[in-house]
């Protein structure tokens, strides 16, 4: 005999909600810092540390905080006199502590530097730097990775220096120094930059090959007279030629294939229903 059909259950079957999948395209180019030699790393750190110490550049912070004094108890005349004496002593000691004002000691030298990721980023956007240094201890690495494209687009030499924050932060009186930039108007670090720039490795960004320059070439700046003579020597035919020609020995930019990347959340995660559905089920 055939089995009798079963009556459908009273409770409604709960449908599983499909997991949201985020689809995006990956980045085919790998952006990375140039490899700095160990000897060059020690030379850069030692040179900057010695120069900063000789200039006396340091940030002084007033760490003395006013401690809350307990309420005065009126017990006898002796205690009140003691409290008055201690108050007068504190007033006398305050001017001694405030004699050394908080802030940067040589303000003019501080204006020649860009300290911190935000300052270095803004200075690179305005094309105000001669050299940009980033600390390798910055985590996550994406915090300083944008400095690679920025520095190459502006033609500014940049490199990642290990132990930059560990060596320079105590000298500057800061907790950490994740990025350091030297502005174009610097006069206090002129000789140091001439010695450091040849040791900076060259950065490689695939879509910014025209902006790449050798740091050593930046040291030998041409005079305005020589530039004017070259412009006068160029004929009208040379100026009328199309400018979009690859230089000799320059490799053309090759388009890389893109891959579709899907981000799927964890399916094993226990997701609680919203409060509105909880109250409806009850």
UniProtKB/Swiss-Prot annotation:
Component of nuclear RNase P and RNase MRP ribonucleoproteins. RNase P consists of a catalytic RNA moiety and about 10 protein subunits; POP1, POP4, POP5, POP7, RPP14, RPP21, RPP25, RPP30, RPP38 and RPP40. Within the RNase P complex, POP1, POP7 and RPP25 form the 'finger' subcomplex, POP5, RPP14, RPP40 and homodimeric RPP30 form the 'palm' subcomplex, and RPP21, POP4 and RPP38 form the 'wrist' subcomplex. All subunits of the RNase P complex interact with the catalytic RNA. Several subunits of RNase P are also part of the RNase MRP complex. It comes from the Eukaryota. Belongs to the eukaryotic ribosomal protein eL8 family. One of its GO terms (cellular component) is nucleolar ribonuclease P complex. The keyword RNA-binding does not apply. This is Ribonuclease P protein subunit p38. It is found in: Nucleus, Nucleolus. Residues 269-282 have a biased composition (Basic residues). Keywords: Acetylation, Nucleus, Phosphoprotein, rRNA processing, tRNA processing. Component of ribonuclease P, a ribonucleoprotein complex that generates mature tRNA molecules by cleaving their 5'-ends. Also a component of the MRP ribonuclease complex, which cleaves pre-rRNA sequences. The modification Phosphoserine is found at residues 12, 226, 235. GO terms for biological process: rRNA processing; tRNA 5'-leader removal. The modification N-acetylalanine is found at residue 2. Its main location: nucleus. The keyword GTP-binding does not apply. GO terms for molecular function: ribonuclease P activity; ribonuclease P RNA binding. Residues 88-97 have a biased composition (Basic and acidic residues). Residues 1-21, 61-103, 262-282 are annotated as: Disordered. InterPro entries: Ribosomal_eL30-like_sf, Ribosomal_eL8/eL30/eS12/Gad45, Rpp38.
């Amino acid at each position: 005999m055939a089995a009798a059909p079963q009556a459908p259950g009273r409770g409604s079957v709960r449908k599983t909600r499909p997991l949201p999948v985020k689809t995006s395209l990956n980045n085919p180019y790998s952006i990375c810092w140039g490899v700095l030699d160990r000897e060059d790393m020690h030379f850069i750190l030692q040179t900057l540390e010695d120069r900063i110490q000789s200039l006396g550049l340091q940030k002084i912070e007033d760490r003395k905080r006013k401690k809350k004094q307990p309420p005065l108890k009126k017990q006898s005349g002796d205690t009140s006199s003691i409290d008055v004496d201690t108050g007068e002593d504190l007033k006398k000691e305050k001017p001694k502590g405030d004699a050394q004002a908080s802030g940067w000691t040589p303000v003019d030298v501080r204006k020649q530097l860009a300290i911190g990721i935000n300052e270095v980023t803004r200075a690179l956007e305005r094309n105000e730097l001669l050299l940009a240094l980033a600390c390798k201890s910055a985590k996550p690495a994406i915090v300083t990775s944008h400095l690679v494209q920025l520095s190459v687009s502006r033609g500014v030499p940049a490199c990642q220096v290990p132990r930059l924050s560990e060596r320079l932060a105590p000298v500057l009186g800061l907790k950490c120094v994740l990025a350091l930039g030297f502005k174009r108007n610097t006069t206090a670090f002129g000789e140091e930059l001439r010695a450091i720039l040849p040791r900076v490795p060259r950065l490689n960004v695939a879509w910014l090959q025209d902006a790449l320059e050798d740091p050593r070439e930046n040291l030998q700046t041409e005079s305005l007279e020589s530039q004017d003579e070259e412009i006068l020597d160029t004929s009208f035919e040379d100026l009328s030629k199309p400018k979009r020609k690859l230089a000799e020995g320059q490799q053309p930019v090759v388009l890389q294939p893109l891959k579709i990347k899907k981000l799927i959340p964890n399916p094993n995660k226990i997701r609680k229903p919203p409060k509105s559905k909880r109250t409806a089920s009850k």
